[in-house]
Each structure stands twice: as C-alpha cells, then as structure tokens.
Amino acid sequence: MNLKEKHIELNDEEIFYLDNESKSEKNILFIHGNMYSSSCFIEIIKELEDYHIFAPDMRGYGKSSYNNKITSIYDFVSDIKEFILRLDIKNFTLVSWSLGGGVALELARDKDIKDRIKNQIFLAPFGYAPFKTNGADILTNNFHEYLNNFDFINPQKNLEIIKGLMTFNMNLIEDSFASMGMTGTELKKDNIRVLFKTFIYNLKLPEKEEFERNVESAIRQRNLDEVAGILRDYKYHGGSLAMKSLVLHGYDDKIISYMDGKFLADEIGAKFEKLDNCGHSVMTDKKNLVIKNIKKFVEE
C-alpha cells in the first residue's frame, strides 16, 4: 500500500497523519486511543486500499506536536474538526478506538462536521462514564443496569466483571502513566510492554513489529497528565446520534467494561455487538471482523 506520512499546520500545532492518497471518493477517518497513535491502525488500513484513508495523530501523540496543552477533550475535537475542514473530507466513515471514541462522539454533535460523517464504528469506546470513581462506586451507581445485563448462563463471567470493576480504577491508570515517566528509554519500554500485555493484549499479542511500533507510540506521548484529567472528567451527554453507528466491544476488555460499551450504544442509538474472546484491542483480537464491518459501512 502507498501510505504517505504527511503534516498539516492547524490550531498552532503540526498534526501528523497517514494518507494513502487514494482517488476513491469513499473516505475513512481513523481516530486512535490513548497511549497510541495512527500507527495502531496500520494493519487494518493495509486491507482497505480501495478507499481513501486519513489517520491523524492527535495533539501530543505520535509524531504530532504538543505546543499547547490540552485542557479538555474538546481540544482534541477542535483539532480533528479543523483537520476535516482543511482537507475537506466529506461523506466519510468515522472509525474510533477507546479515547478516540469520545472525540468521535463530540464530532458527531458539531454543526459543521456532523453532516460530513456518513456513519460511525466505535471500537471499545470511552464515553459512557468517566474514571472519576473507583470500581466499587461505579458498580454501586449502576447496579441495576449491570444486574439486568448479567450472563446467567456463564456466571463466572459476572465474577470477572465485578472483580474488574472493583480493581481497575483511576489509580491504576495513573500508576501506569507514572511508570512511563521513569528515566531511561528501555526501562520505560519494558514497563509499557508489561502494561500492554496485561491490559491491552491480554488475549492475543500482535506481531512483534506491530507490537514494538505501538510501544514506540506510547513513548512519544507527551500529554499524560492532561489526558488523565480527561479520563476522570469526561462523560458523553449528547443523546442519540444522527448517523448510523455500531459499537464493537470485547467481553474480556480490561480497560473499559463491555457493559459500558452497551450502555453507550443504547444512549446514542447504535447497534451493539459483544465480542467473545476479545479484549480492549478489538483491531488485534477481531481484525477480520473489524475490516468486514468497515467495508460494509463504507459501501452503504
């Protein structure tokens, strides 16, 4: 695939992005998650050469600049909005992962952008609930919702969900971020590798080249503290989306509970698919399914 590395200046930042320079009028825009960059989508993009691909690194990630600190998720939204307008991307399928899902949700509400979005696919999206409280509080606040969605055929899964809610909280995220601030590049990389294997790739590891590429992306992140604030504070309040949307979420996600994905799908009027044997990296664990759904959405 002819995948070009490009830069565009906007909002006093230099935003890096991948562009396959396709002549197709069928466009796809990818928005990556936290600790990653556009490179996390490369293996998916390789299978989409018939379409015009745009995949930016958000401010403070990957090869993009970080001249101005972000103060909320809306700074990311502003950058991607300007990116879309400057490149005049129209009638596109928006594919987002994790933190990128929150950015995509807000773009879908923007008066200048929403009519440009053809449809959306959310992969393990962030946005239903902030990581402001610990797992026990989250479980208490949403107990009836969780109870209604329990798997009574496979009760062991419910115990795993509760355990995850009780133990995965903002302190864990911040500890992980702190480990990335350690001195010594190799030490940082070793900590990131452990973090990725434990929480992101808990079921299946990517090929070594892809795995190390993603480790390099994490090393490049410069907005750790600011993003931690976003994870604590952001919750989507925009109601149903105007465009067709799909949420794909792994049953074994250790970062964002698949139930949060379901609740978000209900809130935005999206179709929801719970994916068995799938963790947070939906692109890794269910690569073919992701590609199939993207092609289906683009061709509609």
Description of each model-found segment:
Residues 20-65:
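Conserved HGGG/HGGXW glycine-rich cap/lid loop of the alpha/beta-hydrolase fold
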Residues 1-28, 49-51, 85, 89-90, ...:
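Alpha/beta-hydrolase fold catalytic core
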Residues 156-240:
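Conserved alpha/beta-hydrolase catalytic His-Asp/Glu region
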Residues 254-260:
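Conserved alpha/beta-hydrolase "acid-adjacent" motif
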Residues 120-181:
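Flexible "cap/lid" loop of the alpha/beta hydrolase fold
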Residues 255, 278-291:
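Catalytic histidine-centered segment of alpha/beta-hydrolase-like enzymes
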